[in-house]
């Protein structure tokens, strides 16, 4: 029987602890670099993730997002820097790291001549499960992903949503502590997206540590408690989803309709430096102003009326995560 070596010692400076729990991070990334010939895909990335956190990883195509995730999943080697998962260095102990993580890539390969059960059984064998344990674990993941009723269906007959469920089931087969999910809901229809998000919430409720990427920030805002933004290979933001909503100030965004000539509203905005014109409309405009005061909206509308701008209707919109993302990238 092979003896698993103990986790690598982690330098004291490389550990950040939660003030409330005193728990060391389950994922620790330090000064990570990855260079392909002359292209620096990842440049000095560092972050920590605590056990049980659900972390959203956001970045445009070519930002270094997938490269970072592949290195975390032991599928690529860093040029320099380090990644530790569960106390094991990904370069020194890749086998031990793979036992602790579940990796779900953005592209799902189909084995057309396999059924759902045969596919999961194949991966169960690769993890070294004995027959009884393998059957039990396959039954558990098929029940969780709602694939049990179609266990005998051929893989090439699956919808995109069912295929993603199967890929998630394979990811969960060895019951990993950490899930690394690269664009898991990409290409799914609205119904399948909702169902997939429900599965992620259930896994988070079980205490899994989840590191998930997506281009749809609003979805990550619903699922994640922490956000990481990467741009040009560097981390440009690391904070809670709630704090991200208020990045760059608290913006109040309103759609205003006026009676008479809408040009009067545009002129009024130009004379008030604290107000920004976002978009002109047929009978009004979309405007924005910065304020953290609850009474600010009423005060601004009252000022408009007193200044001779006849407001007939308005609608307030919440600041979107996409707005914060754009603001952050502008200031990089």
Model-identified regions with their sequence ranges:
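C-terminal coupling/interaction segments
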Residues: 2-9, 292-332
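Hydrophobic/anchoring residues in structured secondary elements
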Residues: 59, 277-280, 316
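Conserved protein kinase catalytic domain
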Residues: 98, 142, 245, 325-326
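Hydrophobic alpha-helical segments typical of transmembrane helices
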Residues: 119, 137, 154, 240, ...
């Amino acid at each position: 029987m092979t003896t698993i070596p103990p986790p690598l010692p982690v330098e004291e400076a490389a550990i950040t602890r939660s003030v409330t729990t005193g728990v060391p991070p389950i994922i620790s990334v330090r000064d990570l670099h990855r260079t392909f010939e002359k292209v620096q895909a990842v440049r000095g990335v560092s972050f920590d993730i605590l056990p049980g956190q659900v972390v959203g990883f956001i970045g445009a195509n070519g930002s270094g997002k997938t490269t970072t995730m592949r290195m975390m999943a032991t599928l690529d080697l860093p040029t320099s820097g380090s990644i530790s998962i569960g106390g094991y260095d990904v370069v020194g102990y890749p086998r031990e790291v793979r036992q602790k993580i579940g990796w779900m890539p953005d592209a799902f390969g189909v084995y057309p001549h396999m059924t759902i059960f045969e596919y999961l059984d194949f991966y169960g064998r690769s993890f070294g499960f004995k027959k009884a344990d393998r059957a039990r674990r396959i039954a558990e993941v098929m029940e969780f992903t709602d694939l049990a009723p179609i266990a005998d269906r051929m893989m090439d007959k699956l919808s995109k949503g069912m295929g993603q469920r199967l890929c998630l089931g394979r990811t969960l087969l060895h019951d990993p502590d950490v899930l690394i999910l690269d664009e898991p809901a990409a290409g799914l229809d609205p119904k399948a997206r909702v169902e997939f998000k429900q599965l992620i919430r259930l896994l988070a409720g079980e205490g899994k540590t989840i590191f998930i990427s997506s281009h749809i920030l609003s979805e990550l805002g619903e699922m994640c408690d922490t956000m990481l933004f990467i741009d040009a290979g560097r981390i440009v933001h690391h904070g809670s989803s709630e704090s991200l909503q208020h990045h760059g100030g608290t913006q109040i965004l309103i759609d205003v309709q006026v009676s008479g000539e809408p040009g009067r509203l545009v002129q009024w905005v130009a004379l008030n430096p604290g107000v920004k014109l976002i978009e002109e409309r047929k009978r009004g405009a979309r405007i924005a102003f910065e304020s953290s005061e609850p009474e600010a909206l009423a005060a601004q509308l009252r000022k408009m009326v007193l200044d001779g701008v006849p407001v007939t209707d308005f609608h307030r919109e919440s600041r979107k995560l996409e707005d914060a993302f754009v603001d952050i990238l502008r200031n990089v």
